[in-house]
Amino acid sequence: MISREQAREFGLAQRNQLKRAGLQDIPKRRFDPLEVLRAACKDHVPKLLPVKFERMRESPFAFFRGAVEVMAADLGAQRYTRIEVQLCGDAHLKNFGFFATPGSDIVLDINDFDATTRGPWEWDVKRCATSIVLAGRVAGDSNAACKEAARIFLRDYSAWIERFTDMPSLEVARHRALRDYRDPFIRVALKQAERATPLSNLKKLTRRPGRHGYRFISERNLIWEVSGTERKSVLAALPSYRTTLAPDRQMIFDRYRPADVGFKVVGTGSVGTRDYVVLLFGRDLHDPLFLQIKEEPPCAYASYYKDRGAPRNQGQRVVQGQRAMQVFSDLLLGWCSISGRDYLVRQLSDHKSSIEPEELNGGRLAEYSRVCAELLAKGHARSGEPVALASYLGRSGKAVRALLQFAVKYADQTESDYEAFQKALRRGFAKKALKSAGRKANHTPRERSSRPRPSSQLVPEESVPSSETDTAKAAESGS
């Protein structure tokens, strides 16, 4: 624990480590971004990679979402400050959303922490500001409007960091972004969160064949039923997951019993990772619970910044990062391991929804950017030293101007990467990535048909897209 004066001096000293004008710099690359992307996919489920790439090719913003490893490599090659916070790691507009608190209030906050780690504060800010520019361009906003929205985000982030320096630590820890969401577009997302309940998921994701209870609907919303040894391995991990819950949460979990296990395709960046869903019931069939068991690979920033306090289990890393940045976290948030892989466990789509950034046109983009600025600043102030950060930023606007220049230049670079990605797909990039992933992945059931099926076998052969038509349908259905 350092004093306020020590924190102020440390922040000012960081201007020697990285001048504020240097925040705009983007060094010339010494790597091929497509090779970085392909390397990141090597441990993915091979036949789901076409779905991932199909989603990434929708727009430069979608590509940006699916290529966090590329930006991590760019950021890791730059000079950075030593002002450390808990990073979201993948701070873009789509990763802010509504969800229910343990007390059933609906709140808006950062909601994705797959890439969370301790690291330099500016990495989150640069990624989020870039996402604002890209989202605005995809929505049809002018370059001037996109730049202005990013400027508002950066200005408000700095202002909130300054405000947090005058708040008691407990007040910072409890801070909630309170808004009267009058915009019809945002209110639609809020209403969706209110309607997304376990009972609504039961109707949407499952069927009830006769007297055999509820089962996941195969292929609908890209969920497939899991059976055999694979199912047993997933269920066998639940007792270990239970130990990661607080005693009062364990009592809640103990009221439920598993009924079915499925495999789900999720998101854009996460497509290809292993993701299970478990349906459980409490006292009767009107008391369902859906758990998502989501594979967590090593952090995208691990090669560029050493988080000395990071736990070995990647699911635990995500849980700890989420709790550090959020005021409220999922009631049943925990972690486990299955067949040597680490997983995050949480409720599936319980009162959750998010804004579609591509539709944030006009004044909506700027207004939503203000909310995101407050939420990101809150997460950084909770987990870092706001006095040091405010001292570094100052009040002259130098840091804001430099970061704005970075956001515009990096958005331009992302669009160039997107064009290169499109060309690479036409030249067989997907096949090369599939081949690389196939060398590292387990054999398919067909290849192992004469041997006992191992617990690490993840997706039945018939469950994954096997043709361009199937892939297109999968991509259109979303997550």
Show where each model-derived region lies.
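Long, low-complexity segments enriched in small/aliphatic residues
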Residues: 176-237
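Conserved ATP-binding subdomain of kinase catalytic cores across diverse folds
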Residues: 2-88, 93-191, 243-451
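Intrinsically disordered, low-complexity regions
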Residues: 12, 211-214, 439, 479
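Intrinsically disordered, low-complexity segments enriched in small/polar residues
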Residues: 9, 208-211, 226, 278, ...
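Long, low-complexity, intrinsically disordered segments
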Residues: 448-479
